Amino acid sequence: MPKKLSKRFKEALAKVDQNQTYAPLEALQLLKETATAKFNESAEAHIRLGIDPKYTDQQLRTTVSLPKGTGQEVRVAVIARGEKVQEANNAGADIVGSEELIEEIFKGMMDFEVLIATPDMMPKVAKLGRLLGPRGLMPSPKGGTVTADLTNAITEFKAGKLEFRADRTGIVHVMFGKASFTPEDLLANLKALQETVDRNRPSGAKGRYWRSVFVSASMGPSIAVDINALRDLKLTEV
């Protein structure tokens, strides 16, 4: 049975022409106008790429540093031992531990958005793969979350660095700020995301790489973005 649309959503939907592709800044202004829920909604990007992630040379998993931040506090957990524990604490990690933290996570403790591990701890962290993998939280070198440079990694993730990947259908879903951001700040973050996706194009990607880009507030309607206009935009213009 079709889900009944709320009055709020219908009013937001009426502001968007579903047959139109919008210039990037106009799309983000619309995103703000359609963020009418009673909380500060996230700004989301949904990017459909011409890749088939079932092939290893068509997988996309990387990180983006959002120049205007994420708009939310990011809780970082670190698995390390020895002097690296103190380094992680000094750098501002929210949760730090060794084998005991691995056991806590194994039992279901998930009070963090980012999990970083030092390389020497990865053989022990491996047991968490089935638990963390589906949640996108498993530390990985590609994601910048397996590293000996804990100070830099913690600082970057706290400041707005995000890990993302294409799902099994080749779509990237990323929260790139809050609806309370200015359109210009949202555009700076969206541009950084676009450049990162282009820079990390999988070697096996063939044909047209960019298929579609939609943005939305987390409780709002989808707004189609002009891909070429976004890619042609220079960051100095943002």
Curated annotation (Swiss-Prot):
Keywords: Repressor, Ribonucleoprotein, Ribosomal protein, RNA-binding, rRNA-binding, Translation regulation, tRNA-binding. Transmembrane segments: none annotated. Belongs to the universal ribosomal protein uL1 family. PROSITE patterns: RIBOSOMAL_L1. Part of the 50S ribosomal subunit. PANTHER family: 54S RIBOSOMAL PROTEIN L1, MITOCHONDRIAL, LARGE RIBOSOMAL SUBUNIT PROTEIN UL1M. Gene3D superfamilies: 3.30.190.20, 3.40.50.790. Binds directly to 23S rRNA. The L1 stalk is quite mobile in the ribosome, and is involved in E site tRNA release. Protein L1 is also a translational repressor protein, it controls the translation of the L11 operon by binding to its mRNA. GO terms for cellular component: large ribosomal subunit. This is Large ribosomal subunit protein uL1. One of its GO terms (molecular function) is structural constituent of ribosome. Coiled coil: none annotated. It comes from Rippkaea orientalis (strain PCC 8801 / RF-1). It comes from the Bacteria. One of its GO terms (biological process) is regulation of translation. HAMAP family: Ribosomal_uL1_B.
